[in-house]
């Protein structure tokens, strides 16, 4: 067991070691589906007021752990902290999502981009990591569950930086990629350096695993995905600290819509690959043949179904993977703000119960 961790099931699963049951955590597990999160956000005044205050970030990171016996905590933050630190002027408008005051569109904009000083500009994130680690640890120095740090991928960050916010079709960033690949690669190079430095700073502050969210990699065509996303994920992974404080630090990457490229993603040097719900988990396990762990991959909208259906679909995911090491249960994307916390409780219980039955051979 990782030293002083009361529950290291998540870390052992990422390293493909045997576990008594399948660990579970959920993307966006600290979020708007929880009434207590909304209460804390109201006190903070805004999303950025929440994310940039280590006390609030710690409070909301721990909220889902108070409700559910989840096997990992994930830092409460946002993937757009890096471009914000680059001076692009991040703001969240109610009902509109993130917007940048200074999108990166011209040659001059690209020339101005630089890797931010992580401690000077993103010290609130590393401060939150340290504070969360303390909050997860009891008076005897025993930590409840591991803490995950994260970043957006170079390509996904570039999507927001060039578009100036979210997009239905990403035509501005894709147009740049195809018409001025030199500018696109310059942005991606700066982003890759920044992401690696940012994740390493989180690891040094106490993150025990890190995840790269490539939310928009699946928007790219085959070939373009390799050039503009995967190549830069590989660069990031090659620069990461894989051990800290005497313990291995596993790396997860998740490309939404990336099931086509599973084998290539698995070859980037990561320890685990996250999958969305379009991928057959059992077939994916055979495709990677034990080279990496897999994370996923329940369709998050299943949580709107009645509890019996939630449990049935959770069992289907677990049965698909089978009695093999190297599976972390998660959703195929972030949990919806409209999800009932009671249904999440049903899911967590079923994952733990049924995976124990699979291990013991009692699952029918």
From Swiss-Prot:
Site (Transition state stabilizer): 78
Protein purpose: Catalyzes the decarboxylation of four acetate groups of uroporphyrinogen-III to yield coproporphyrinogen-III.
E.C. no: 4.1.1.37
UniProt pathway: Porphyrin-containing compound metabolism; protoporphyrin-IX biosynthesis; coproporphyrinogen-III from 5-aminolevulinate: step 4/4
Annotated CDD domains: URO-D
Single biological process term from Gene Ontology: protoporphyrinogen IX biosynthetic process from glutamate
Gene Ontology CC: one annotated term: cytosol
One Pfam family per UniProt: URO-D
Example GO molecular function: uroporphyrinogen decarboxylase activity
Subcellular location: Cytoplasm
Signal peptide range: none
UniProt cross-references to SUPFAM superfamilies, sorted A to Z: UROD/MetE-like (SSF51726)
Catalysed reactions, semicolon-separated: uroporphyrinogen III + 4 H(+) = coproporphyrinogen III + 4 CO2
Cysteine disulfide links: none
Family: Belongs to the uroporphyrinogen decarboxylase family.
Protein name: Uroporphyrinogen decarboxylase
Record keywords: Cytoplasm, Decarboxylase, Lyase, Porphyrin biosynthesis
